[in-house]
């Protein structure tokens, strides 16, 4: 199943090579993850979330699919109230990360720093509070720094 045109140009394959190597139980889920990752890189977050969600159906143990959902919600400056919080998705990724590569575990742990139940519960889209706490953003940035170096 493809949730988007199969000829969609995601740019240079080197931009999303990481996506082709994620820990995943089957190739159908991996192919959908690559599609989701491409949409994520192109800021097509709603389509990326739909594709990452399909990955969780194809492989419920794919921690990086849950990470992808949380990442799309947390990095989306055009956040829509219907997208919700990334807290529950990243907690699902945390619960599944044991079988992941070290890099995947580090990415999951870093993004988990950006979400809290308190921020999720305090979100109020009517006043543009999307549960995106500045202190949590700093914690995420600090957790990502060693991965960049």
Feature names for model-found ranges:
Residues 1-27:
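N-terminal pre-domain segments of enzymes
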Residues 28, 62-63, 100:
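Residue-level recognition of tetratricopeptide repeat
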Residues 38-47, 69-101, 109-130:
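Inter-helical turn/loop elements of alpha-helical hairpins
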Residues 54-57, 95, 149:
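Conserved structural position within tetratricopeptide repeats
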Residues 121-149:
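Asp-box/WD-like beta-propeller blade repeats and closely related beta-sheet repeat scaffolds
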């Amino acid at each position: 199943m493809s949730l988007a045109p199969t000829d969609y140009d995601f740019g240079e394959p080197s931009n999303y090579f990481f996506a082709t190597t994620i820990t995943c139980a089957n190739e159908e889920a991996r192919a959908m993850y690559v599609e989701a990752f491409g949409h994520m890189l192109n800021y097509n977050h709603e389509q990326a979330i739909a594709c990452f969600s399909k990955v969780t159906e194809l492989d419920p143990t794919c921690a990086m699919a849950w990470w992808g959902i949380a990442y799309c919600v947390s990095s989306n400056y055009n956040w829509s109230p219907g997208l919700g919080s990334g807290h529950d998705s990243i907690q699902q990724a945390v619960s599944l990360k044991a079988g992941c590569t070290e890099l995947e575990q580090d990415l999951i742990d870093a993004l988990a720093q950006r979400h809290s139940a308190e921020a999720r519960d305090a979100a109020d889209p009517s006043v543009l509070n999307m549960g995106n706490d500045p202190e949590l953003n700093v914690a995420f940035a600090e957790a990502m720094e060693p991965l960049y170096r």
